[in-house]
Amino acid sequence: MYVVLEGVDGAGKSTQVGLLKNKFKNALFTKEPGGTKIGESLRRIALNENISELARAFLFLSDRAEHVESVIKPALKEKKLIISDRSLISGMAYSEFSSLELNLLATQSILPTKIVLLLIDKEGLKQRLSLKSLDKIENQGIEKLLTIQRNLKTHAYALREKFGCKVLELNAKESVKNLHEKIAAFIKCVV
């Protein structure tokens, strides 16, 4: 089973992934972008270099293609539980150039079985971002991140509608413990 956690920066994905590592010790934990050695290099270029948005989108698509080929496919073949911090959903939400068609090509149509969507309101996002150093995307501001969050939700539900992916939508302002319990139960529930 392939499970992804999605949400804007500051929604608590990394915290939840950390807790899930203790709960699902035999799972394969990965991330996008940067889930492979090549992916780390592509991610660094995409986030830190002054390049066009189109070039950035293709770097992330390249990372996604390599990630699926070298990490996701082998783990699925071994019937492992895969838990990923981000996926193609982020790729589509963060870039105007990253379409579903391009992402299906990059992922060889391998899609998450389950999507955990952590959503946060404007005040919660402001508070959390004030506590960390910001990257190029986060520096675009709260309104930009809220637009990205709406896109994440739209794309997650589009995958549910078109491909049957299961979606668990959570309020990221709930307690870390409550969120963890709900996410763990969602992962354990085999439909």
Curated annotation (Swiss-Prot):
ATP binds at G7, V8, D9, G10, A11, G12, K13, S14. One of its GO terms (biological process) is dTTP biosynthetic process. Gene3D superfamilies: P-loop containing nucleotide triphosphate hydrolases. InterPro entries: P-loop_NTPase (IPR027417), Thymidylate_kin-like_dom (IPR039430), Thymidylate_kin_CS (IPR018095), Thymidylate_kinase (IPR018094). The keyword Cell cycle does not apply. It is an enzyme of class 2 (transferase). Its EC number is 2.7.4.9. GO terms for cellular component: cytosol. Pfam families: Thymidylate_kin. GO terms for molecular function: ATP binding; dTMP kinase activity. The keyword 4Fe-4S does not apply. Transmembrane segments: none annotated. Keywords: ATP-binding, Kinase, Nucleotide biosynthesis, Nucleotide-binding, Transferase. It catalyses: dTMP + ATP = dTDP + ADP. It comes from the Bacteria. NCBIfam families: DTMP_kinase. Belongs to the thymidylate kinase family. Phosphorylation of dTMP to form dTDP in both de novo and salvage pathways of dTTP synthesis. This is Thymidylate kinase. The gene is tmk.
